[in-house]
């Protein structure tokens, strides 16, 4: 059993802003229900360009529901410029903490928000799982590229493959890519150390 904070339990048992915004300005979808986690985030802007309404639908665990609920509370009233600066760590901070093995739930919320903002601006979805997606596919089970692994590692100061699994699920199914993930991390941190 996971050890959840009172805030996590409150957002899980009483999630805020569940559903879909009618005629949304932005829609972001990440994850895959077949893999166990999926999130759809919709928002509507007011006349001043602030997020007036935001809702979510998620297929996932208590941490996924709580993270999504907390995210909607966090960004309500923000401009898109302010909202796009929200990180998964901001979501975790609002909740108090999340078990390390559930950190991917906060990352999923941040990605859904970034996806919705990109689509609103007419930009490509940065998290689309298609052949044009940037980077080399490393984890076939969860569709995670080297670019995403590097991004998550830099943003969260992650140094081993197990930590990456907790944050973006890469390596969490068959495990065949764990060696590749560790090599990517080792190379990145060696390069960063050499730059100092």
What are these regions (language model features)?
Residues 1-23:
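Extended low-complexity intrinsically disordered regions
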Residues 35, 44-110:
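Active-site- and interface-proximal helix/loop "cap" or "latch" segments in soluble metabolic
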């Amino acid at each position: 059993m996971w050890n959840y904070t009172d805030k996590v339990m409150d957002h899980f048992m009483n999630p805020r802003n569940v559903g879909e915004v009618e005629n949304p300005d932005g829609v972001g979808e990440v994850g895959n229900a077949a893999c166990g986690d999926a999130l759809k985030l919709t928002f509507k802007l007011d006349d001043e360009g602030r997020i007036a309404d935001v809702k979510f639908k998620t297929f996932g665990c208590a941490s996924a529901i709580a993270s999504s609920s907390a995210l909607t509370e966090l960004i309500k009233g923000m401009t898109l410029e302010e909202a796009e600066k929200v990180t998964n760590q901001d979501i975790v901070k609002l909740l108090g903490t999340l078990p390390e093995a559930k950190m991917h739930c906060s990352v999923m919320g941040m990605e859904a928000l970034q996806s919705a903002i990109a689509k609103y601006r007419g930009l490509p979805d940065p998290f689309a799982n298609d052949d044009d997606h940037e980077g080399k596919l490393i984890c076939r089970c969860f569709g995670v590229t080297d670019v995403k692994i590097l991004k998550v590692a830099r943003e969260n100061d992650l140094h081993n493959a197990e930590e990456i699994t907790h944050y973006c699920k890469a390596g969490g199914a068959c495990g065949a890519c764990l060696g590749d993930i560790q090599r990517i991390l080792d190379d990145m941190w060696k390069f960063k150390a050499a730059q100092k």
